[in-house]
Structure formats: structure tokens, C-alpha cells
Amino acid sequence: MVEERKLYICMRCGRTFSRSEMEILPGIRCPYCNFKIIMKVRSPTVKRIPAV
């Protein structure tokens, strides 16, 4: 099985979790503390764009 990356972080408890963990509860909430405000984690790689 392919390991799923952790994409979201809770603004209250600070835990990171994946979308599949978030789908356990109805609606968009933290699966650990049931808080509604979550943030998507940015990717660690830098996107380079050539200058025009």
C-alpha cells in the first residue's frame, strides 16, 4: 500500500493528518479534537518559475 502524505494541520491541537483521516467525521473537522478550522500544509519543495 502506498503511504499517504499528511496534508492538513489543525489550528487548535497542531496535529497533522491526511484527507482519509479527516473523512471519519461528517463535515470538515479535525479527527482528534473536532475543531473546524484546519489548514492545508504547504509542500516542502520550492517551485521555480523562469523570469519573463
UniProtKB/Swiss-Prot annotation:
Cellular component GO terms, alphabetical: cytoplasm; DNA-directed RNA polymerase complex
Signal peptide: none
Enzyme type, top EC level: transferase
Gene Ontology biological-process entries: DNA-templated transcription
Cofactor section: Zn(2+)
EC number(s) on file: 2.7.7.6
InterPro entries, sorted: RNAP_P/RPABC4, RPABC4/Spt4, Rpo12
Note describing how the cofactor binds: Binds 1 zinc ion.
SMART domains, sorted: RPOLCX (SM00659)
Coiled-coil stretches noted in the UniProt entry, renumbered to this chain: none
Record flagged with keyword Zinc: yes
Disulfide bonds: none
Binding site for Zn(2+): 13, 30, 33
Lineage top rank: taxon: Archaea
Subcellular localization, as worded in the UniProt entry: Cytoplasm
Main location class: cytoplasm
Key word Cytoplasm present: yes
Alphabetical keyword list: Cytoplasm, DNA-directed RNA polymerase, Metal-binding, Nucleotidyltransferase, Transcription, Transferase, Zinc
Protein purpose: DNA-dependent RNA polymerase (RNAP) catalyzes the transcription of DNA into RNA using the four ribonucleoside triphosphates as substrates.
Subunit structure: Part of the RNA polymerase complex.
Assigned protein family: Belongs to the archaeal Rpo12/eukaryotic RPC10 RNA polymerase subunit family.
Name of the protein in question: DNA-directed RNA polymerase subunit Rpo12
Gene that encodes it: rpo12
